[in-house]
Amino acid sequence: MEEIPAQEAAGSPRVQFQSLETQSECLSPEPQFVQDTDMEQGLTGDGETREENKLLIPKQKISEEVHSYKVRVGRLKHDITQVPETREVYKSEDRLERLQEILRKFLYLEREFRQITISKETFTSEKNNECHEPEKSFSLDSTIDADQRVLRIQNTDDNDKYDMSFNQNSASGKHEHLNLTEDFQSSECKESLMDLSHLNKWESIPNTEKSYKCDVCGKIFHQSSALTRHQRIHTREKPYKCKECEKSFSQSSSLSRHKRIHTREKPYKCEASDKSCEASDKSCSPSSGIIQHKKIHTRAKSYKCSSCERVFSRSVHLTQHQKIHKEMPCKCTVCGSDFCHTSYLLEHQRVHHEEKAYEYDEYGLAYIKQQGIHFREKPYTCSECGKDFRLNSHLIQHQRIHTGEKAHECNECGKAFSQTSCLIQHHKMHRKEKSYECNEYEGSFSHSSDLILQQEVLTRQKAFDCDVWEKNSSQRAHLVQHQSIHTKENS
């Protein structure tokens, strides 16, 4: 990079500008200014170059950085749109934290890029902007965005330095995103970002180069709170504790999400359709669930059945529907009608008889009696997974799998269980109770399975006796192997 002499011909003052491409003289009425907030003022009055200004960024280097930046932004957009909207993915806090850190890096890269590149269309001259006059004054256009723009102008003919700074306007506190924000304004991408519930935090990232580095793995964060959360991975610290079940978590958000298991709270409610959502009080626990539910209202039905021209929004629903036209494994023995599901067949068979549809046995179980064949019904259905049960108590016990409820608590150690049988079995450990005794030898067991296993061992023992020696074997193969010793001796 060539240095411009500080003095030209006498009587023709020049103004020195720091440019991204090169340090050039302003000889045109429309100069191009480029910001570099990290640089000090360029040249002293006698033309000597300061040490800080020797490292100017070449144009080729900037082009490479811009290209790399665009490629990375494209990859990030692709990764975010490809995130599966299932509960299992969003429960993985490690993947969520990695995705957040990726986006923070790109926002930081965008901010750095904007600090060193300012288009000349951003500036407009209100006063004299020609270069042949010693006193120069420039101003910014009223449409300039909120970032701070600093322009330093030096008069090389005089030792007086004109340091003209153009600061940010009243809206400067708000961090704006140029290309990145516009790219993510599409409904599909923005929905994925908002689903992560951290878009507002990313927009409020301060315009600073301060960073926090992890001493263990070297990972860099832009906020001290993010570093503190990350360090809990190495220390395995879990400061947030649930008062209900005493389970600990490393993040407060995880504890809040866990508390919904005890309170059965479902805060995400669909407002798109009163008929299918609010009328039935349709709500979902994780944010991914409500997004998946909202797609019922917005998704186009693009899967069409070739036989009956019925349209479905999901391919699995179409596949299940096509079984009606192809596979009919359930057949009515009265009229010969075919059905694809057993439930449809049972519903149909009620038409053929005028008798009482339900009969009850001594246990209170309901049956459908038709031509001597008993079809046991399961009238209790789980609203979460659709599984059917014959007794209401079985349904209540099954629903604890979804809610995570452990209603049966041990009085001695405080451990909780979802089933009464598990609690009773646990109590035997404290009492050291062994209620299952063996009749053949003096011994008792706390579990019936242990007793059965011991009895099987005793029945196998001494089942195979040797005729020569008084030796017993529990397996025939051992006896045959032993008897081969006698056959060799006799031979």
From Swiss-Prot:
First and last residue of the signal peptide: none
Outcome following mutation: residue 113 to G: Abolished interaction with INTS13 component of the integrator complex
Biological process terms in GO annotation: negative regulation of G1/S transition of mitotic cell cycle; regulation of transcription by RNA polymerase II
SMART domains: ZnF_C2H2
Chain positions of all zinc fingers (C2H2-type): 212-234, 240-262, 303-325, 330-353, 380-402, 408-430
One Gene Ontology term, aspect cellular component: nucleus
Record localization: Nucleus
Annotated keywords: DNA-binding, Isopeptide bond, Metal-binding, Nucleus, Phosphoprotein, Repeat, Transcription, Transcription regulation, Ubl conjugation, Zinc, Zinc-finger
Effect annotated for changing residue 102 to E: Abolished interaction with INTS13 component of the integrator complex
Glycyl lysine isopeptide (Lys-Gly) (interchain with G-Cter in SUMO2) crosslink location in chain: 77, 190, 201
Chief localization: nucleus
Pfam name, any one: zf-C2H2
Domain of life: Eukaryota
InterPro entries found in the cross-reference section: Krueppel_C2H2_ZnFinger, Znf_C2H2_sf, Znf_C2H2_type
Region spans: Disordered: 1-52
Residue stretches of biased makeup (Polar residues): 15-26
The keyword ATP-binding appears for this protein: no
Effect of residue 108 to A: Does not affect interaction with INTS13 component of the integrator complex
GO molecular function, one term: DNA-binding transcription factor activity, RNA polymerase II-specific
Family of the protein in this entry: Belongs to the krueppel C2H2-type zinc-finger protein family.
Quaternary structure and partners: Interacts with VAV1 and CDK4. Interacts with INTS13; promoting association with the integrator complex.
Biological role: Probable transcription factor.
Protein name: Zinc finger protein 655
Species assigned in the record: Homo sapiens
Gene: ZNF655
